[in-house]
Amino acid sequence: RIAFLSDHEGVGNLYSCAHDGSDLRRHTDHAEFYARHAAGDGTRIVYQCAGELWLVDDLSPGAVPHRLDVHLCGPRAGRRTYQVPAAQHVDGVCVDETGRASAVVVRGSLHWLTHRDGPARTLTDTPGVRVRLPEMLGESGQVAYVTDAEGEDAVEIAHLPRASGARPPRRLAAGRLGRVLEMVADPAGERLALASHDGRLLLVRVGETEGQESQEEQAGQEGQEGQEEQEGQAGQSVACDVTELIRSVNGPVRDLAFSPDGAWLTWSHPGIGRSLRQIRMARIAGPDTGPVLDVTDGRFEDENPVFTRDGRYLAFLSWRGFDPVYDVHTGDLSFPLGCRPYLVTLSSATPSPFALNPEGRPAAGGLDPVGYEDEAGDGTVTVEVEGLASRVTPFPVTASKYSALHPVAGGGLVWLRWPISGALGETFANPDDLSGRPTLEHFNVGRAQKSELVGDLDWFAVSGDGTRLVVMDEGDLRAVPATEAGDGDSTVWIDLRRILHQVDPAAEWRQSFDEAGRIIRAHFWDPGMCGIDWDAILAQYRPLVERVASPDEFADLLREVLGELGTSHAYVAAARRNEGPPHYQRPQGLLGADLVCREGQWVVRRILPGDSSDSRARSPLAGSGIREGAVLTHVDGRAVDPLTGPYPLLAGAGGTTVELTFAPAGESGGGAARRVAVVPLVDDRPLRYQHWVARRREVVRELSGGKCGYLHIPDMGGSGWAQFNRDLRGEVFRPALIVDVRGNAGGHISELVVEKLTRTILGWDVTRDAQPVSYASDAPRGPVVALADEATASDGDMITAAFKLLGLGPVVGQRTWGGVVGMTGRHRLGDGTVITVPMNAAWFAAYGWSVENRGVDPDLEALRTPLDWAEGRHAQLDDAVHLALTLLAERPAAAPPAHTDIPDRTRPKLPPRNGQD
């Protein structure tokens, strides 16, 4: 009998059947948790269920599984506390008013760290509680942050360390905020603005009442004696005002920013679709509070609005550049350079700093004669609503990709500028080049001058007064000036080793389990959870957290929990502890060739030809003069072992230079040996993939007599788009076309592929010395047949459905994977585990919701059996080509016109005048 696990009856259990598939039996009856990881010895089957081992003695109808009680004598070392290096676990930084110190979040704990010397001080570090999004409250000596100490997000206000003693933190609005995505404080530290997952923009007043102040003063007077006991304790919940300013119906608002006087709040508001956003603002303080104002109209993607520190301007980033760039291969046009910062003068009485000046611009390095800095505002914001949108002006900088816009001292701005690079990372000559990282730039608004502050960084934070920046660069934290490039004297390197954080794995896993549950509940595509009692599911699995003893086990548990969603794209990636120095590890070296052992010699049987259009698909032996049949004898002067071969000698050699010694074919020690220097590949999959595609194209050519073109699309991302366009022009001109999406890993560009394949030939462009070209160009000339299988997934499901719904052509193969509830982004839990949430569900007029968990059925079912595979037969390709040729016979391919019936363009003879012969 054949034993296997299946959940076809709703829950995973152990089954068996006869070799022909008959006599199906169920051997276990687990109704709550899945039976998993079955293994057998030919008679007995062992498996795990809910963290316990179970054994089935045989596959007879009456066999009853029984639990194995395994007692471990040693401690579960994976649950012991351990220390982590802070530099590898920084989750957020908030700089104080002057840039002297920062509040640093390290793996869910919050620490106060002076930049130059001084000790680190723990503000809050409670095992099982995660702290996020710290914000300084002006110069009040307090810091706000988001905590989940009560099981839902709340705001907590903590006092910075001081000599008079510790004061307990205050907790506000627990359970009233949803999942907080962003939080900013006004300059005075009296209010917080929060963006929630459900589209709400909330205002929270954080000022203390008289009773609260007296209680905290009393706590502070207890002195240093009780200080250590109070550190890390839970905050006291107090009442507060939470005001909903606005609610978005198209997803969360983001990029919140207060004006320098604290009277105005601006943000980026989502529009219909996935890219349109508009800048909005509202007066939230003073006697003239009024309705929300639209700064921009939502036609473009506008984001990251900020007020300049003088209060005269609003700046934002906008993707509204429409200077098309021609595609060098297909002639298509795209907009890769669409982003630029823009400036809005808030009052018509304020001149644009970019307008022409009758006095001209100052000489380089000189002072502006109009005295911009002297006339700058005091931070009070005056908004003239009439004509606001018409006062939007682009910055005089090159269009590129920008992010992280912030105001700094002197009325200037800083931002990150990103290089334009390819989706596959092949833009830069050296794969290890860091030039794909952003550059931090400063713009002096008064002088309209741009300067570079820091090159190649990760992210940065700004001090409260805008004079200093804290820059994160691959684990190194440093403070630099905000308005000019730093030097040795002005740059302060911040020693993160002063932060000592002990991780309690058991407490972290409990917190991360609950946090994962909240994230799923907040972001799952259906608010009703498709009928699932999510709280009951979490309660069912929560006791199993106490059995977890490693990050991998915790990730495995979360996979079971997310599996209860019955939905695709619910992934879990395990955390890594990263304690201690990183292990020295280099990738295996690969030669891009197949070697076989013949009579104790390692012979080059085949050098993969590769593809010159793919820089990753080239064998190191190509062009070296080594031919198939040569014998590899030495690697870096070390003899190749006849038994283990060259691979142990190439361990760790990937990406570095090695010397290979070859003997001519048939020679073991004599003959003229040849030494070559090569750089082994770290990954030969692109090379083998291109060879795989070339072989199948040859099969299609042979089966069709050259009448069928062949395209394979490995995924619906950057590599799939590249592969599709790599061969489209050469294959689409043939009478029929096979589009192979077997094994397609999904992505998001199926619409682009469909646009190409749905082009119709309406006519021909005829020229004198070349073959006619179809209009539309690169359109299929005849029938198109799709190939799909059970590994055609996600956006591969989508394009297979599109083939059928649009009538592009029949689908041959197997039913597709069936996963069309996509994800957007990834969520990192407190312990470092990463999860994804199914957020975007696909619905089709013809299928409804049924493609999810079902897939798309082919028009012609074809299966490549293991025997076909072993004997080199291509059953699915055979059927696809046969069907394409049948359709071609019924509907011949479009052909250019014959060179006949050419119009006569000779000038007609002038007729006689009227009344004359």
Which positions does each model-derived feature cover?
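Extended, small/polar residue-biased N-terminal targeting/export presequences
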Residues: 546-603, 671-696, 881-916
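A flexible loop/linker signature enriched in serine peptidases of the S9 family
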Residues: 1-15, 29-36, 46-58, 71-78, ...
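Short coil/turn segments that connect the beta-strands within blades of beta-propeller domains
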Residues: 42-43, 98-100, 139-141, 188-190, ...
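Short loop/turn segments that connect beta-strands within beta-propeller blades
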Residues: 18-22, 58-61, 115-118, 160-164, ...
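Cleft-lining beta-strand/loop regions that shape enzyme active-site pockets
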Residues: 611-620, 633, 638-639, 644-830, ...
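PDZ/PDZ-like domain segments forming the peptide/carboxylate-binding groove
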Residues: 586-642, 840-841
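A short beta-strand motif characteristic of beta-propeller blades
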Residues: 23-28, 80-82, 121-124, 168-173, ...
